[in-house]
């Protein structure tokens, strides 16, 4: 089951806009200091880099992703997540709006 809401957060109101608007997210911090972002990727194939490790949780739509150093595309749908190591890259391929929560590890 996908996460539907968070309570007691501090939200950054200015959006993070990547790839000419193909990915838009908002960052927020939980009361315990945990940082996350919530966003949407519009249809495209994009490459993202990571500084911290990330867990991408699908809350709407679906995507295909390929981790750095692999040739295999995998699918993530609502309620599923995938892990990206710190200081890495991943490709994401979206054919319909993909809604996600990024959990920074």
Language-model features: locations:
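Short acidic-glycine-tyrosine-enriched beta hairpin
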Residues: 70-90
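General beta-strand recognition
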Residues: 37, 47, 64, 91, ...
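A short, N-terminal "cap"/entry segment at the start of jelly-roll beta-barrel domains
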Residues: 1-34
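A generic structural motif
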Residues: 29-31, 66-68, 93
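Conserved short histidine dyad/triad with adjacent acidic residue
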Residues: 29-51, 81-86
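Ligand-binding loop in jelly-roll beta-barrel domains
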Residues: 85-105
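Short, conserved beta-strand element in jelly-roll/cupin
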Residues: 50-65
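Acidic, Ser/Thr/Pro
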Residues: 10, 20, 25, 38-42, ...
């Amino acid at each position: 089951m996908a996460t539907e809401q968070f309570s007691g957060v501090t939200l950054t109101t200015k959006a993070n806009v990547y790839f000419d608007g193909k990915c838009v997210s908002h960052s927020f911090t939980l009361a315990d200091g945990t940082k996350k972002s919530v966003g949407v990727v519009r249809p495209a194939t994009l490459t993202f880099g990571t500084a911290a490790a990330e867990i991408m949780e699908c809350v709407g739509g679906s995507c295909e992703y390929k981790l750095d150093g692999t040739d295999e595309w995998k699918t993530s749908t609502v309620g599923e997540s995938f892990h990206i190591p710190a200081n890495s890259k991943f490709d994401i391929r979206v054919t319909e709006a993909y809604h996600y929560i990024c959990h920074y590890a």
